[in-house]
Amino acid sequence: FKLSSKKITNSKNTFLINNYIEIKKYLGPHGSHIFYELTEAIKYNNYLTIIILSATLIDVIKNEKTSIINSLSGVEINSIFSSYEAMWLRQTRNSIVHYEKPIDGLLGNKEDNKILEEYSVKTISILSKIMNEILKLK
């Protein structure tokens, strides 16, 4: 697929793109559909959607009983899915979808889009790292 944001798909963030088919074959039906929707969001720079779907995908991968997850030990699963970065991503997603107070990127300022783009770049980097760790352990 072709992506439009150079920042989101910089050299550090090409893992998901370069390994799309490999990743997709290890996902269950729920995760696979979310992964497809995520790639569509990346194509069109839908920053909020990228953040929301990336965090959701991490949770689905952890809980959808696929052969790759079933092959991991409890320690490996905790190590991968309970990292500081994964927690940041979940908290960021939750602050978007469960409004409690204004957050960076959604304040109505002219810098909002830049902040959301930066969050999206970080998000894709986190998801790529998690997917890479899972695939290395298979």
Region spans (language model):
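Amphipathic alpha-helical interface elements
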Residues: 2-73, 81-88
